[in-house]
Amino acid sequence: GENYFIVRTKEELESLDFHGKTVALDIEVSGNIKTDPWATGEIIAISIYDGSAAYVISSEVAESHESAALMRKLLADDKITVVTWNGTFDIPYIVRRLGLDTKLHEDHDAMLMHYSLYNTAGEHGLEPVAQRFLGAPDWSGEIKKYTKGGGHYERIPRDLLYYYNGADVYYSYQLYLLFHEALENDPRSRAIYEQRMIYSAMLQEIQPNGIPVDLNKMSELRAKYEADREAALAVCREVTGLPKFNPNSPKQVKEAIASLGVEVPSTSEDILKQARYDNPEISPLVDAILAVRAATKVIDSYIDNTVKLVGE
């Protein structure tokens, strides 16, 4: 339509000028962002809405030098206000794929605006929020049959994908106008939003390049916590007299504490701590059980999981 343009050539890209405007920005990518290594999928559409028209940069030129130059100008020009919906995903992805400065980020995130105003809302996705506040239609309905089982937006016919991407920025822009006015009249929510934007900018700078991880130090920490766990496990088995006592077994823990004359309704941390407070005589066993659990959590949740992510 007259307010919807597909940008298919480098010349058309170079002709775009958004100086002095507020624009909404969104991307679509190939692959499955939930399972694929981060930013390995190509950007197959970039959409910009400037308050009067949507410009959808097609897959042929979305990752071109001209596209990179336009994105750099959008994000660096202080006379252009860039709005996203969950820019913590889009902006680092653009930065990584197009080779931009990691300190570039959007000016406003309408999703964080919504979260700051309505943090107890059950849904913060663009489409349901647009339907609630703007009476928007189900504009993604047609694409769902192509994306079953994962992302893979490359499966969507291009013209349909571009329409979907254009609708995303149109509604992001309209919601931005609505929430911006609401925040102007709500100082408390505005302060929360401004703080969240600071956190978002920090995360965006980190994501394209990651953070350094000292694998030698991680190995040292793992050895330390393994030793702590083994020492606590030895105490558990000494106190209970059971060489195969398993502190992760609720049944065994209940029976062991009962053998000391104390009944507990569950083996949750809070219950065990309360039982220990009420019955100091079980402290050696409870302390050891909790120490085993704590060391296991550090090893499994933090050390091992962090090491697994190195290089992704």
Predicted regions mapped to residue ranges:
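A short acidic, often aromatic-flanked loop/helix-cap motif at beta-alpha or helix-coil junctions
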Residues: E12-L13, E63-H65, M113-Y115, V253
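Acidic beta-strand-to-loop metal/phosphate-binding motif
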Residues: A24, K79-G87
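Metal-dependent phosphoesterase core characteristic of DEDDh/y 3'-5' exonuclease domains
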Residues: I44, Y49-G51, G87-R155, L177-L178
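Nucleic-acid-processing active sites and adjacent nucleic-acid-binding tracks
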Residues: D50-V82
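Short, well-ordered loop/turn elements at secondary-structure boundaries
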Residues: F18-G20, E42, L75-K79, T102
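Conserved "right-hand" nucleotidyltransferase catalytic core of DNA-directed polymerases
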Residues: G1-S59, A121, F133, Y146-E312
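Short amphipathic alpha-helical segments and helix-helix/interface helices
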Residues: L13-S15, A45, S67-A76, I91
